[in-house]
Amino acid sequence: MKTFSAKARDVKRDWLLIDADGKTLGRLATKIASCLRGKHKPEYTPHTDIGDYIVVINASKIKVTGNKFEDKIYYHHTGYVGNLKSIAFKDLQTKNPETIINKAVKGMLPKGPLGRDMFKKMKVFVDSEHTHGAQQPKVLDI
């Protein structure tokens, strides 16, 4: 018997809706990354993109444990000498809350072209309104 290997063209992709209201950031991000990779499907193949589309709503209401709300800092470098920029979690949550979930999930996906394609299938919205009602996403409880 030959080993089954899923093909990207044969995969049926679902649309899943996740409400981030009151959820812990890391636990939510691991579930999203797992669904984007397709690990919840029986035909999972590591080298093929078979994951589902994910719509995340209420990104501004995400929670973190401990003192991370005050202490967590996100860093990025501009590429110029001495330009290491930083922003605190609480400032980022008020300014651009979808970035928090994007950074957490992107770090859990494979690096390279496959991971970039997986990441493009995640749509994050700040409040409970989203633009993907026509796709009829199924609610996924976490």
Swiss-Prot record:
InterPro entries listed in its UniProt record: Ribosomal_uL13 (IPR005822), Ribosomal_uL13_bac-type (IPR005823), Ribosomal_uL13_CS (IPR023563), Ribosomal_uL13_sf (IPR036899)
One GO-annotated biological process of the protein: negative regulation of translation
GO molecular function: mRNA binding; structural constituent of ribosome
Keywords: Ribonucleoprotein, Ribosomal protein
PROSITE patterns attached to this UniProt entry: RIBOSOMAL_L13 (PS00783)
One term under GO cellular component: cytosolic large ribosomal subunit
Superkingdom per UniProt: Bacteria
Quaternary structure note: Part of the 50S ribosomal subunit.
Biological role stated in the UniProt entry: This protein is one of the early assembly proteins of the 50S ribosomal subunit, although it is not seen to bind rRNA by itself. It is important during the early stages of 50S assembly.
PANTHER family, sorted: LARGE RIBOSOMAL SUBUNIT PROTEIN UL13M, RIBOSOMAL PROTEIN L13
UniProt similarity note: Belongs to the universal ribosomal protein uL13 family.
The protein's name: Large ribosomal subunit protein uL13
Species per Swiss-Prot/TrEMBL record: Vesicomyosocius okutanii subsp. Calyptogena okutanii (strain HA)
